[in-house]
Curated annotation (Swiss-Prot):
A Pfam family per the record: SH2
Segments forming domain PH: 168-279
Region (Disordered): 1-25, 78-108, 128-160, 290-313
One function term, GO molecular function aspect: signaling receptor complex adaptor activity
Phosphoprotein listed as a keyword: yes
Post-translational modification: Tyrosine phosphorylated.
Keyword terms, alphabetized: Phosphoprotein, SH2 domain
UniProt function note: Links T-cell receptor activation signal to phospholipase C-gamma-1, GRB2 and phosphatidylinositol 3-kinase.
Name of the featured protein: SH2B adapter protein 3
InterPro entries in the record: PH-like_dom_sf, Phe_ZIP, Phe_ZIP_sf, SH2, SH2_dom_sf, SH2B, SH2B3_SH2
Amino acid sequence: MNEPTVQPSRTSSAPASPASPRGWSDFCEQHAAAAARELARQYWLFARAHPQPPRADLVSLQFAELFQRHFCREVRESLAGPPGHDYRATAPPRPALPKARSSEDLGPRPACALQHLRRGLRQLFRRRSAGELPGATSDTNDIDTTAASRPGPARKLLPWGLREPPTEALKEVVLRYSLADEAAMDSGARWQRGRLVLRSPGPGHSHFLQLFDPPKSSKPKLQEACSSIREVRPCTRLEMPDNLYTFVLKVQDQTDIIFEVGDEQQLNSWLAELRASTGLGLEHPDTELPLSLAAEPGPARSPRGSTDSLDQGASPGVLLDPACQKTDHFLSCYPWFHGPISRVRAAQLVQLQGPDAHGVFLVRQSESRRGEYVLTFNLQGRAKHLRLVLTERGQCRVQHLHFPSVVDMLRHFQRSPIPLECGAACDVRLSGYVVVLSQAPGSSNTVLFPFSLPHWDSELGHPHLSSVGCPPSHGAEALPGQVTPPEQIFHLVPSPEELANSLRQLELESVSSARDSDYDMDSSSRGHLRAIDNQYTPLSQLCREADV
């Protein structure tokens, strides 16, 4: 009897778990091999117990026929009931997989793909929404409650930011703007193009401004609530001689911004809208005059509302800020201190003689930073501005340099060049200064007093004056007609009476011979005098007459 020889099984009783199939062909190959190994092992076990077993090829054909029948029945039952366990005891139970058209669908699907999509859309439209003020936060529970109240697909797909009404834009315009920072003080205004939007978040909330640069940008470059704006006013012709329709916006703890619109109608419209939004419309009714009124001559106005004093230098009649009053008494007695004149006016004063006045200077109050000061000087015919910081004790700081006083700073820059970005090519030392004196006791208008009057010394280059009076202080504490005790640093200044007599004599002389005098009458200024040359005094007397 030919009986088959029983062969030991070459397969392990506990094979390793097969790797995940990459496709249907791999799936069938993998499970067919596993079923063949199991069938061969069972075949040899059965052959040992039963003599004369059938041939292996016959067993495989019968197994394939029966396998097809049982496999189809198991698949139909697995769709209706819970998934059954695999017939292989060594393999872990696997969840039944639905029918798929590709191998990518064989793995388990994500738990909530729609939820991830909705979260991503919500974040996207949140950034594009121009809704809330900076610092405002939204509560997640409120968002979910609002979304849950929406029926249908809008509740599941659309984010809350898209369904809420957008913030109302009250006013919008494309314009030019410039930041009034330290760089603008040195090199002039640098204009940029942007879009200014005034928005209202709703009743009970403060309006806020947004500045977009470039104009088509969706994210604002600057955004401030209107409640933080402390001043909004039109610029004067002296401040912006080449830009007519401009206004300045002063924001608390921020750099001042100058805006330029297209015409006067837009200027007045924006000023009215901003003043109404900030509540500054009634608090500063006479801060500045409109451009059309400032350019026309008219009757004399009060010192607070007059713009004539801006054309003549300082304005002692205007009440100063408390920050300025703390430090102005260190400078108000000196003839080179011009008080609160504009940057443009200071540049005009030091540029009158062009490159010949190289090193001529004056000291003025800062326009943008109240309580600070600016040294304006002539650099080869161009005006430069250097910011000064003055402490309550009179100490002065210029960039990284510290001085005991402003006079010590001027003495230092008389001997050493002023530190500038251009280096040795822009070497400049202080050589003289522009003088400003009060025209009469108690007068709010000032004029430039040239040093060719009343006596001229060609050797020393400075006048010999008979009086030792000091000009009235620019501070609010100076009374009309009161003469401050002299502190002679550069030269001696005449009394107000002598100045008035000299000015009256100049008016008579200017009628007969305009060029014989160092003044020129300006018809547009209604009798005021303006200096045209010889308005400087050398700084060489600074060391000689100091501490007298």
